[in-house]
């Protein structure tokens, strides 16, 4: 199968209508053609600035417009961020993601952000940030500091977007992705499933992502975590098989990308997660919280990986560049030498 950038809604709807087992089989064939099997890339996400966001994203408990239990915090000191990054590395993460509840970073924040990037890079970790919209100059500053990935989700289809967010446009998001790519960084961009969108909207999201000039290197697929106090707290649950189907379709449409299980994984049992890995998911967030929602504990993750024969990647290499027995030794080391959980780690629904 060749990598394409001209997908249509009709093609995606056809994939959605395929028998479940046939779809997973096709996705697994694509996965084995383009990705190493039985490997999962592990990332940790830290909220470096929490709450008081001026935007009105209806899914987000960090919005200042909604009454939630989120405690507001200023931008974290660089030293605290580096301490958290070291703990994440010790626990087995290979990528450290830093998220701030902003519409966009201010110029006064940029020196602190670049110091964080340089410090985390110095530990041998890949770096990722999600800070809201960026100007071309800000993107260049982050890239110069060594930022590897920038996360900026499209969230949903262009047609449904206005039902969820009004404080920035869909084009604003696409422009930020363009600035990131022009600055030479890799892109992490996906969406959220379960906000009341239709099947057509889910297809539209994947079409937007897959028809970008270059596919995002990482595609997080979030399952909405309903938080009390947000406008979406009463929305209907996502049908698990529908979610797994979208993982499979994302793998088929973007075969070279990492497809990440992100927010909502805490609500998935082991069997559902296993089917997601079968469908082509090969990246997870690791730690006790994503930004403001629960995430499976490290122990539960490693137990599941061991049951499935999955090895998480210790370093930023292609899995075929690492000896299999070396990876197994590293998994054992993580299980026996893991530090205690730390409330600094947060789960990602960004």
Swiss-Prot record:
Assigned keywords, A-Z: 2Fe-2S, 4Fe-4S, Biotin biosynthesis, Iron, Iron-sulfur, Metal-binding, S-adenosyl-L-methionine, Transferase
GO terms for MF: 2 iron, 2 sulfur cluster binding; 4 iron, 4 sulfur cluster binding; biotin synthase activity; iron ion binding
Protein's pathway: Cofactor biosynthesis; biotin biosynthesis; biotin from 7,8-diaminononanoate: step 2/2
Cofactor: record remark: Binds 1 [4Fe-4S] cluster. The cluster is coordinated with 3 cysteines and an exchangeable S-adenosyl-L-methionine. Binds 1 [2Fe-2S] cluster. The cluster is coordinated with 3 cysteines and 1 arginine.
Binding site for [4Fe-4S] cluster: 53, 57, 60
Domain named Radical SAM core: residues: 38-256
Superkingdom of the source species: Bacteria
EC number from the UniProt entry: 2.8.1.6
InterPro entries, sorted: Aldolase_TIM, BATS_dom, Biotin_synth/BioAB, Biotin_synthase, Elp3/MiaA/NifB-like_rSAM, rSAM
GO annotation, biological process: biotin biosynthetic process
EC class of the enzyme, as a word: transferase
UniProt family annotation: Belongs to the radical SAM superfamily. Biotin synthase family.
Subunit structure: Homodimer.
Name of the protein this chain belongs to: Biotin synthase
Source species of the chain: Vibrio campbellii (strain ATCC BAA-1116)
Name of the gene this protein is made from: bioB
């Amino acid at each position: 199968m060749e990598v394409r950038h001209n997908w249509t809604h009709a093609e995606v709807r056809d994939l959605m209508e395929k028998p479940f087992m046939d779809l997973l089989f096709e996705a697994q064939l694509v996965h084995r053609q383009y990705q190493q099997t039985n490997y999962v890339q592990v990332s940790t996400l830290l909220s470096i600035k929490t709450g008081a966001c001026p935007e009105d994203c209806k899914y987000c408990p960090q919005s200042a417009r909604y009454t939630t239990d989120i405690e507001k915090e200023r931008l974290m000191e660089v030293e605290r961020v580096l301490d958290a990054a070291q703990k994440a590395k010790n626990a087995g993460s290979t990528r450290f993601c830093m998220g701030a509840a902003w519409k966009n970073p201010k110029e006064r924040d940029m020196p602190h952000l670049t110091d964080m990037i340089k410090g985390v890079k110095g530990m041998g970790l890949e770096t990722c940030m999600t800070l809201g919209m960026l100007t071309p100059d800000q993107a260049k500053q982050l890239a110069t500091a060594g930022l590897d990935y920038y996360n900026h989700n499209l969230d949903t289809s262009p047609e449904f977007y206005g039902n969820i967010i009004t404080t920035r446009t869909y084009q604003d998001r696409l422009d930020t992705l363009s600035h990131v790519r022009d600055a030479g960084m890799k892109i992490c961009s996906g969406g959220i499933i379960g906000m009341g969108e239709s099947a057509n909207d889910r297809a539209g999201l994947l079409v937007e992502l897959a028809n970008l000039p270059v596919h995002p290197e990482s595609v997080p697929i979030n399952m909405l975590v309903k938080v009390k106090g947000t406008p979406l707290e009463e929305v209907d649950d996502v049908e698990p098989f529908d979610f797994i189907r979208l993982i499979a379709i994302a793998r088929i449409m973007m075969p070279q990308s990492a497809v990440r299980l992100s927010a909502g994984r805490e609500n998935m049992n082991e069997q559902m997660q296993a089917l997601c890995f079968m469908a082509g998911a090969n990246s997870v967030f690791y730690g006790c919280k994503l930004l403001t929602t629960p995430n499976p504990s490290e122990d539960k993750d490693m137990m599941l990986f061991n049951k499935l024969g999955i090895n998480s990647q210790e370093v930023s290499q292609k899995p075929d560049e690492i000896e299999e027995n070396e990876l197994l030794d590293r998994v054992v080391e993580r299980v026996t030498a893991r530090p205690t959980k730390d409330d600094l780690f947060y789960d990602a629904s960004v």
